[in-house]
Curated annotation (Swiss-Prot):
Name the UniProt record assigns to this protein: Protein-L-isoaspartate O-methyltransferase
EC number: 2.1.1.77
Keywords: Cytoplasm, Methyltransferase, S-adenosyl-L-methionine, Transferase
Species annotation: Bradyrhizobium sp. (strain ORS 278)
Cysteine pairs bridged by disulfides in the record: none
Subcellular location(s) of the protein: Cytoplasm
Stated role: Catalyzes the methyl esterification of L-isoaspartyl residues in peptides and proteins that result from spontaneous decomposition of normal L-aspartyl and L-asparaginyl residues. It plays a role in the repair and/or degradation of damaged proteins.
Family the entry assigns: Belongs to the methyltransferase superfamily. L-isoaspartyl/D-aspartyl protein methyltransferase family.
Name of encoding gene: pcm
């Protein structure tokens, strides 16, 4: 990190390291993405606090540690094709864009999708495609993915989403009740087998099927 970096950003990186984030590429991506561009204007001064924050449409921008942790668990390579379910502010997609060549991110709220697209274009994240759609019912033409990240809580991971994984692919998602604590789950595909590992407790807004009729 440059010696002229703001103190709050230097502390931000220190917190991530102290909490166990060790992948240098992930840390660098977290450093490069300006989180203040993704929070509400009233929250810009607190953008580097390690906490989730409210955004539009009743949604949230995830806690930075959780973003870094989920990204690290994906074990990304540049050639990977990544699917994100739940664009939100676009922050997670911007981090992914620095680590892999192609990201498709799907959002059910038009307002969030449009604003995220604008932010990502402003930051030259031209390898990210923002789609207004239903994460539970992707179009057949969306294809297969090396990595899938879900940023809203699912009560269970649908088989249709698991089937989108390429062989040796990894999916990570919060699984559990829509209100309360969920478990972050990592699923690895080996042939037709899906090996599941529970990681840590998290709290995410619920994943809702369908495209929002308003907002």
């Amino acid at each position: 990190m440059p010696p002229t970096a703001p103190p709050e950003k230097m502390m931000f990186q220190l917190i991530l390291r102290r909490r166990g984030i060790s992948d240098q590429a992930v840390l660098r991506a977290m450093e490069e993405v300006p989180r203040e561009e993704f929070v509400l204007p009233a929250d810009r001064a607190d953008a580097y606090r390690d906490s989730a924050m409210a955004i539009a449409c009743g949604q949230t921008i995830s806690q930075p540690f959780v973003v870094a942790y989920m990204t690290e668990q994906l074990k990304l390579q540049k050639s990977h094709r990544v699917l994100e379910i739940g664009t939100g502010s676009g922050y997670q997609a911007a981090v992914l864009a620095r680590l892999t060549d192609h990201v498709l991110t799907v959002e059910r709220f038009r307002t969030l999708a449009d604003r995220a697209r604008e932010r990502l274009e402003k930051l030259n994240c031209f390898n990210v495609e923002v789609m207004l759609g239903d994460g539970y019912a992707l179009p057949a033409g969306a294809g297969q993915f090396d990595r899938i990240i879900v940023t809203a809580a699912m009560e269970d991971i649908p088989q249709s989403l698991l089937d989108r994984l390429e062989p040796d692919g990894i999916l990570i998602a919060p699984v559990g009740p829509h209100h309360g604590v969920q478990r972050l789950v990592r699923v690895t595909r080996t042939g037709d087998r899906f090996d599941r590992k529970e990681l840590v407790d998290v709290r995410f807004v619920p994943a809702i099927p369908g495209i929002a009729r308003e907002l």
